[in-house]
Amino acid sequence: MQFLLWSTGLVALLSWLIYTQETQSASCRCRPWESCWPSEELWNSFNTSVDGKLHRLRPAAHVCYGPSFNRSACDNILLLSRDSGWRASNPGVLQDWVWEAGETANESCPVGSLRTASAVNSCHQGRIPLFTVGVESTKQVQEAVRFARKHKLRLVIRNTGHDLAGRSSAPDSFQIHTHRLQEIQFHADMRLDGSNTSLGPAVTVGAGVMMGDLYAQAARHGYMVLGGDCPTVGVVGGFLQGGGISDFLSLNQGFGVDNVLEYEVVTADGELVVANALQNQDLFWALRGGGGGTFGVVTRATMRVFPDVPVVISEILLEAPQAISSSWTQGLSIVLTALQSLNHDNVGGQLVIAVLPNLAVQASIKFFFLDATEAAVIDRRMKPFLTKLSRANVKYTYSSKNLPHFSSNYRQVPDIHSDNDYGVLGSTVAISQQLFDSPQGPEKVAKALANLPVSAGDLIFTSNLGGRVIRNGELAETSMHPAWRSASQLINYVHTVEPSIEGRAKARERLTNTQMPMLYALDPNIKLSYRNVGDPNEKDFQQIYWGPNYGRLSNIKKKWDTDDLFFSKLGVGSERWDSEESDEVYFFSYFYLEGINTLKVARR
């Protein structure tokens, strides 16, 4: 009798599983080998609807391999591969090879010496999408979204390809490339439709505009813009939807999302909507920190701009033969104490530590004295800190310069990649004001940075928070983790990756299991990371990125995107999908004779 009951239960369970497999298979993304994949006729029809902007996509380096080999074209690719601007505009390449390659050595198409280093003799698609639409209008974005939804394609939203967690690519995917949406329009007195309330000067920016281009245009209009320091990062993509931390200006002006006034978004049903404080307020809240590529395709955004002002920049340079030494640690402690002190006077600064090929270390800390015009005055203000360095026998060099406009500080030249073909992975941890402003705070941070195991080529740098970031907590309603409003500094760690699949796996393991636990242990008051530069293996991403806001974000996601057309790695709702977000993850339980047990997660 017991066997009969067990057998009956097992048959019922298997029948239920088969039913689930059949009825829920439509939830998974369609792959090229499946019957659901669009026919050539459908692709051609779609291409007509987007004015011929659809292209079959091959990795940019395919001209260096096999039947596609072309010597002059390959040499040109090798030359261009160091140009970040070229990488931003080319949909078949990312800013870093790490997320171009698949999980095995035969799933990549590397450029340059990577070909030898990874022993790849042929070109494979890897994580580069199969098709791309180089959209030039919101209508084309709408058509692309509707096509992806209708055919259940794995959709990737890509702007400049800077994402360090692999969100700009995915295997067997369909890409919307927003880089050609290049609108820049300034408003002397911004007002939302239906409102007479003045919001001050602002700029409307298309999804494809890069930081350097916006800075240049803003300078011509007498403005400075809160943004990142890399000129080829897109303004409106992950930066302005994931938080928008400015290394230099967040102390004085807050986060990028604090200063967004309006988004224009193509939603999962292909509709174009406006989200601001007066309409679609839930979507507006979610986009202000909920992460890019998650709630829709943002085609443009409007954000505040600020009067361009003069600035004096002072810089202290330190150098040591090795990171673990008392003199190096003491030097870091002194310059971080200077940062602590000057932050109280709204003077922002940034510390950058570089590990040289011989494992010697260099540090540069710059301070930005806004509205200052005389370098000599600032030099006198910096003298007490320089005296401390001298008394501690720390070798340093000091310089200062005054610029008539802060916007002049931004680089107006293309980013140049190193020629060693190494990739990078990165992550971040926030340091609370409670720790950093304590008497021992700078020393504790200095010791943690000095003791962190590093490799040649690694970078560690800080981003200045505090100040307006904290004060905006009472003013700006954003979806960022509330703990940001008590954070003083952000520590960014960029780890080099050897040019091989094995090197990538080793780097990811070391980042997740060694370096990040050490950095998180620095401040027990806060466990917080910046999603835009977060560990791609982060297990507790919901809490670490959004904390108590995650539940509301998840509900808004379900409202605006019921089928999860938009998703990104470690994004809102991504826990419902597998690691490449192509197959849904199902949890189910069954009754066993001895009680209730939970089966293992089944992936299809």
Curated annotation (Swiss-Prot):
Keyword Oxidoreductase included in the entry's annotation? yes
Keyword Glycoprotein assigned = yes
Domain (FAD-binding PCMH-type) spans 125-308
Alphabetized GO MF terms: FAD binding; oxidoreductase activity
Q: List the disulfide bonds.
A: none
Per the UniProt record, one Pfam family is FAD_binding_4
Q: Which domain of life is it from?
A: Eukaryota
Pathway per its UniProt entry is:
Alkaloid biosynthesis; ergot alkaloid biosynthesis
Alphabetized UniProt keyword annotations = Alkaloid metabolism, FAD, Flavoprotein, Glycoprotein, Oxidoreductase, Signal
Q: Which SUPFAM superfamilies match?
A: FAD-binding/transporter-associated domain-like (SSF56176)
A Gene Ontology biological process in which this protein takes part is: indole alkaloid biosynthetic process
Q: Which InterPro entries match?
A: BBE, FAD-bd_PCMH, FAD-bd_PCMH-like_sf, FAD-bd_PCMH_sub2, FAD-linked_Oxidoreductases_BP, Oxid_FAD_bind_N
Q: Which cofactor does it need?
A: FAD
EC number(s) on file = 1.-.-.-
Query: Signal sequence span per UniProt?
Result: 1-25
Glycan attachment positions? 47, 70, 106, 196
Q: What class of enzyme is it?
A: oxidoreductase
Gene3D superfamilies, per database record = 3.30.465.10
Functional summary from the UniProt entry? FAD-linked oxidoreductase; part of the gene cluster that mediates the biosynthesis of fungal ergot alkaloid. DmaW catalyzes the first step of ergot alkaloid biosynthesis by condensing dimethylallyl diphosphate (DMAP) and tryptophan to form 4-dimethylallyl-L-tryptophan. The second step is catalyzed by the methyltransferase easF that methylates 4-dimethylallyl-L-tryptophan in the presence of S-adenosyl-L-methionine, resulting in the formation of 4-dimethylallyl-L-abrine.
What family, per the record?
Belongs to the oxygen-dependent FAD-linked oxidoreductase family.
Under which name does UniProt file this protein? FAD-linked oxidoreductase easE
